[in-house]
Amino acid sequence: MKPLMNDKRIDSTALAGQELLQLIKKTILTVGYVKEVNVIEEVIKECLSGSIVFLINGASGALVMIGGGGESRSVEVPPTDSVVRGPREGFTERIITNITLIRRKLKNPNFTLETLILGEQSKTTVCIAYLKGVVNPKLISEINRRLNRIQTDVILESGYIEQYIEDAPLSLFATVGNSEKPDIVAAKMLEGRAAILIDGTPFVLTVPALFIESFQSPEDYYIRPFYASLVRIIRFIAFMIGILAPAIYVAISSFHQELIPTPLLFTMATAEEGIPFPSVMEALLMGLIFEILREAGIRLPRPVGQAVSIVGALVIGEAAVSAGLIGSPMVIVVALTAIASFTLPAQTDSEAILRILFVLFAGTLGVYGIMLVFLALLVHLASLRSFGTPYLSPLAPFSLRDMKDTFVRAPFWAMIFRPRAISWHDPQKQEFRLSPEYVSEKSKKTRK
């Protein structure tokens, strides 16, 4: 306000209110961002958003200056998607900061933002971010259609919007991706996806989302491809162990003992002797205890939660075996399942429910029950779509070109094209013949 009070042009001028408003806007205010607003509803919205509104008697409009909006969390290392090598900055609760973090990764004039307000009471700002010319325009139209149909009082977090716009609300699998790391969101936008940013949450939604994304880590692209491929294969194996290990143990120990080698069968029979519960009840009971410990570890403060998870699992497991309530083989199987499930945080929720389904069918139909649920699971996954994109691509429909970034991660110079199921206008993302071997051979010929 000091420049306004000391400026002699304002004291001596005979300008009308609107002309005085333009003079102040163009010559006096030193704020980085100033815009003129002529609608009272827009003025109220800017005030509630933390902006500074400048009104002059006799002027038909108002000047809005973007303020700090109060205290906010600084850019920190996100607790999810942790990496050993790679960027460590994460999104915050401020949408302006999150847009800036993405712009640092994508210094591209085609970077486009579309803004809308959702929530009758909360008036939450939502932005659709995409790269024009890379993303399919039909995808943006579909996102706008689904967002504009949301009529609710409040939007507090991205999970609200995710449940409104997902393709299969009754499915165990999420058809909308999310991340709190700018590098992940930028990489997905470069493949032809769109990002949905919501003010008040560090989690950014990305669509379309594929099943294969759950097995991909950002660190896979920052380390050498051989080790990245090995780790990715381990994640697939861990997922199968996480949903099938207890069920296979229940089926074999209850219905198919002939499949167990004789020495191992005698050992298992000795360990299970005197156990009052059938193996299916053991698996369900230990699974329930594991979920309780996992939930307690998440809700408690981090140092205390880790201690409760580790000590609680050791004490309860040892006590259950000593009391003769649970067999030691089942404790080993459940412990292996728990460790395997931690390798895929994105599928933790679906793994827990699938594990229970497999155990129940294994306890009634044996291996045939496991096969029945597994086939139903494959059919369900093949039927899912995410904003028109097959959820199982590039596996179904099969695309040999895109298999370079599924079970294994090929070198960057070999991944020339964007995903076939997602890319639209510009499928090629780099030039051919970027292999170091080709470059070295070409340099040798040049020297000769």
Where do the language-model regions lie?
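Generic detector of multi-pass transmembrane helix bundles and their immediately adjacent loops
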Residues: 248, 261-448
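Membrane-embedded alpha-helical signal segments
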Residues: 1-244, 248, 258, 262, ...
